[in-house]
Regions:
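Flavin (FAD/FMN) cofactor-binding core of flavoprotein oxidoreductases
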Residues: 217-241
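N-terminal Rossmann-like FAD-binding beta1-loop-alpha1 element of flavoenzymes
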Residues: 4-34
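Short, well-ordered alpha-helices that flank and scaffold nucleotide-derived cofactor binding pockets
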Residues: 20, 24, 101, 180
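N-terminal FAD cofactor-binding segment of flavoenzymes
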Residues: 21-24, 34-74
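Conserved N-terminal helical subregion
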Residues: 65-134, 141
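Predominantly flavin-linked oxidoreductase catalytic cores and closely associated redox partners
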Residues: 109-216
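Conserved small/polar residues in nucleotide/adenosyl-binding loops
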Residues: 243-245
């Protein structure tokens, strides 16, 4: 089996970012890199949003930036500015396309579906897929979001809603999150900070529909994209099974 100088396990945001930085900083001119990723094609599957606290190489993948936001509690809305650290939203589809197009230029970089296809014993391995036990009794941030489009102008795309707590809490922490990409397009997301043992919280579609139609008072819209996920809010247990990681 073929050997590589470097191996990146996981071709998601972290793994591809590392490979991209190695490539653009000319660290792979005389080195080989293998990326282990089970997917056979890349397409938009996530929206990554963050406060821009430093310059980065993916401004051309930013879908929208905001310098103003709101936080809502029942009967009160707080307006805040984030001029020094604007909030940015990156389209994962554009991110994947940019990085993969760059990596394809270097014949020293190869993709594999499984690590069993290569010899890793003498390689320097970066593992971006830690083993996390999916314990539903621990605290998680679990969410579901939809991108919607309206026929007429509806959203103020100069300001986003970071957290709207004016919703059913169900003895947990629950808020909605709205990113207006334009006056007719927005991401609306329901987010819970809770254990994942209450199935009643997982009615994401119903929660979002009720929020859009009865809270935002928007009746005519279409859903163009959907995403969901769960982020552990506890210290994970790592199980190292490979050497040189």
């Amino acid at each position: 089996m073929k050997e590589f100088d470097y191996i990146v396990i996981g071709g998601g945001c972290a793994g591809l970012s590392l490979a991209y930085e190695l490539e653009i900083n000319e660290k792979l001119k005389d080195k080989t890199l293998a990326i282990i990723e089970p997917r056979t094609e890349y397409k938009k599957d996530k929206t990554w949003s963050f406060w821009k606290v430093a310059n980065h190489n993916f401004e051309d993948c930013v879908k929208k930036s905001w310098k103003n936001f709101t936080i809502n509690i029942p009967k009160k809305t707080n307006h805040l500015e984030c001029v020094c650290y604007p909030y940015q939203s990156v389209d994962s589809g554009l991110f994947y396309e940019k990085i993969n197009n760059k990596l394809k230029e270097n014949k020293n970089i190869s993709f594999f579906i499984d690590i069993s296809e290569i010899n890793f014993k003498n390689s320097f391995v970066f593992n971006s897929v830690p083993s996390i036990k999916k314990d539903h009794l621990n605290l998680w941030q679990h969410f579901c979001g939809v991108e919607i489009e309206t026929q007429n102008n509806f959203f103020d795309d100069g300001i986003f809603n970071l957290m709207d707590f004016d919703c059913d809490q169900r003895e947990s922490v629950h808020f909605f999150y709205t990113l207006p990409y334009s006056k007719t397009k927005a991401l609306v997301e329901t987010t819970w900070l809770s254990k994942m043992n209450d199935n009643s919280q997982n009615d994401y579609d119903g929660q979002i529909k009720d929020y859009i139609e009865n809270h935002l008072n928007l009746k005519n819209y279409k859903i163009t994209y959907k995403e969901e996920g769960a982020i552990p809010l506890f210290y994970p247990t790592y199980e190292l099974s490979l050497i040189h990681i």
